[in-house]
Amino acid sequence: MEFRPFDVQLAVAFRGLTSRSGVLIKGVTRDGADAWGEYSPFPDYSPSQRNRWWHAAMEAAHGDWPAPVRDEVAVSSIVPDVPVNQVAELAAAGGCRTVKVKVGGYSSMLQDAHRVEAAAAALGPGGKVRVDANGSWDVDDAVRCLTELELAARRGGLDGLEYVEQPCRTIDELAQLRRRVDTPIAADESIRIPEDPMEVVRAGAADILVLKVAPLGGVHACMRIAEQTELPIVVSSALDTSVGLMAGIALARALPSLPYACGLGTGALFATDTVRTTLVPRDGVLRAQPWDVTV
């Protein structure tokens, strides 16, 4: 196997990050073809968290992925905490018809509402806006903020929000919130070990599960989780480079059902990448592409 360290720059600061670093692992499939995995856990991760990222990277480096049931994957664009005048371009990037707007961070509630409204207006009729609070609200704040953001989406010309991702930090808070709002709730940060999804389901804490390949230990680990629940799955990125995104695409292509656009459009956030041609959506979809690693 071959190991190549990388450090790539983001075009837009994302949750305080301006770059991503890690190691690419080059391996060989059973058929003798090259395969690549990405190991890029965040600096504050624990040894057990890092081990799952390592397992996912080694799985990818052996090309050990399930057979696909679809050729292409509908994805969402992403709007981080940026000024409202940058929202329209980011929201409509790559022809996406769904956008995820980051909320509850450094911006005020009013700024979040302006960005949601601008994103909705940029997509127009038939577009979908989801928001992601990364667990930044308590239950009462979430009720108040979601009321305002639902109104903002309607001012932008849509029927409301598609869903809210991880509005509160704990599973118990998500369950409480779900009983108080009509906005569908997707669990993301609450799902970081294979046992988490069933705890979310048992608590009645979510309508949708967000699965990320690297944090959960690989594509096959995610497939096993999906088999255990009847809740719809959204495959999302852990701010991977294009090499890591290929694992997300492999999962999304293999799932029997994929009713929502996946959160795999994050390649658009990178100024530099680990491949020659960054994986970004075209006409709102991603397709697997040949490896063209440049690091």
Which residues fall in each region the model found?
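A structural signal for the main folded, soluble domain(s) of proteins
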Residues: 62, 67, 74, 183, ...
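Residue-level detector of functional hotspots within protein domains
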Residues: 61, 87, 195, 229, ...
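Conserved beta-strand termini and adjacent loop/short-helix elements that scaffold enzyme active sites
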Residues: 6-8, 78, 188, 236, ...
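N-terminal capping/lid subdomain adjacent to the active-site entrance of alpha/beta enzymes
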Residues: 1-130, 134-143, 147-155, 258, ...
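Catalytic core of soluble alpha/beta enzymes
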Residues: 103-246, 250-252, 269-281
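Short helix/strand-capping turn motifs
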Residues: 257-268
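Short linear motifs at secondary-structure transitions and domain/linker junctions
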Residues: 1-4, 51-55, 160-161, 184-185, ...
